[in-house]
């Protein structure tokens, strides 16, 4: 529960890529639907940075927090890079988005299978 506003987080799972939806219109829809927590579009390449920043700005105007989907924090990135490369990438992601007032968390992945390499990668990314 968000103690600051006494609001229960209500959100949705966002499957869109960056630059597909018009940010202001999407944020207005989220607000009208009563969303208090949104998942960003996928930040997949450096060109998407401004789109995610704009998403955070529009969400902030409406009192909505955002879970940022950034490839640099995902367990797939962890699995395919060294620990040092992953740590550097996460620090860059935090620098880019982590201090924004609308930032809630990074999405580091989903649906790992316990007892597999995927599960170990997910646990490693979460550290």
Each language-model region and where it sits:
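Glycan-processing catalytic domains of CAZymes
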Residues: 1-127
């Amino acid at each position: 529960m968000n103690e600051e506003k006494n609001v229960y987080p209500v959100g949705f799972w966002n499957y869109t890529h960056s630059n597909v939806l018009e940010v202001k219109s999407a944020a207005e829809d989220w607000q009208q639907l009563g969303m208090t927590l949104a998942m960003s579009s996928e930040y997949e390449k450096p060109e998407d940075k401004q789109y995610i920043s704009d998403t955070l700005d529009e969400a902030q105007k409406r009192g909505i927090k955002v879970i940022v989907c950034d490839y640099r924090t995902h367990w797939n990135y962890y699995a395919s890079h060294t620990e040092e490369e992953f740590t550097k990438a996460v620090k860059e992601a935090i620098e880019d988005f982590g201090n924004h007032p609308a930032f809630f968390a990074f999405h580091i992945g989903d649906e790992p299978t316990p007892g597999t390499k995927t599960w170990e990668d997910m646990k490693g990314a979460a550290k």
